[in-house]
């Protein structure tokens, strides 16, 4: 699972 911050990247 990706973190909220990772989704932007």
From Swiss-Prot:
| UniProt-annotated location(s) | Secreted
Specify where it is mainly localized: secreted
Q: Which domain of life is it from?
A: Eukaryota
Q: Which GO terms describe its cellular component?
A: extracellular region
Q: In which tissues is it expressed?
A: Expressed by the skin glands.
Question: Which keywords belong to this entry?
Answer: Secreted
Q: What name goes with this protein?
A: Skin secreted peptide P3-1
Which organism's genome codes for this protein?
Phasmahyla jandaia (Jandaia leaf frog)
């Amino acid at each position: 699972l990706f973190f909220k911050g990772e989704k932007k990247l």
